[in-house]
Amino acid sequence: MQPDGDDGPILDAALELFGEVGIPRTTIGDVAKRARINRVTVYRRIGSKDDLVRAVMARESSRLLVAVAAAAAEQTSRADRAAHGFATTIDSVRTNPVLIKMFDSESSLVLEQLTTNASALLVSAINAAAHIARGELESDTFAVPDAPEIVVRVVHSILLTPSATAPLDTYDDLLAFAHRNIVPLLVGTT
């Protein structure tokens, strides 16, 4: 049995199984077996399968935001931080095999968590976008009011509907798009 509060092994096991067999085919029993714990422990620590999916999605979102912040921090200007933050977010989700499997899942819960119940996820992303774009500045002044929310909603839209008219297939495409459209919202024209 894991120490109280250490849900990492459970979430790791669930994440692996979601990637291997998909969310619909993963059971609490499978997760418990992979985590080498009793099935009751999963229910006690996490809850239902829906709670498990939510917990995995929340943890992966947090990990993604940390990686995006680290990539943005390597840049020297606010404009480059904003552009690389944008491009890294989309590229990281698109290239993560488990997240791809979750996006492609037939699970109505995943779809719900990415659309109608995405507010908690979006708020976290908006706060992270504001922090990244603000950089060393202490104020929340952006070129366009509500710019971090607009940017996150654009990212969200691109992830849910990858293809339209703008070329957004490669990291360089994403950077160019960000410099044309995202940077002016956050930091003004460069």
Please provide the spans of the model-predicted regions.
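Helical hydrophobic small-molecule/effector-binding pocket
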Residues: D80-D104, Q113-L121, A130
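Amphipathic C-terminal alpha-helical segment
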Residues: D91-T95, H131, E149-D169, N181-T190
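Secondary-structure edge/capping motif, primarily at the C-terminal ends of alpha-helices
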Residues: A71-Q75, F103, S107, P162-A166
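Short hydrophobic clusters on alpha-helical segments that form packing/core surfaces
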Residues: I10-F18, L64, V68, T89
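Short hydrophobic/aromatic patch on the recognition helix
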Residues: A35-I46
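Amphipathic alpha-helical packing segments from all-alpha helical-bundle domains
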Residues: S62-L65, V110-V152
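Hydrophobic alpha-helical connector segments
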Residues: D51, A55, V68-T95, P148
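Basic, helix-initiating cap at the start of DNA-binding domains
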Residues: M1-V21, R25-R34, D51-R54
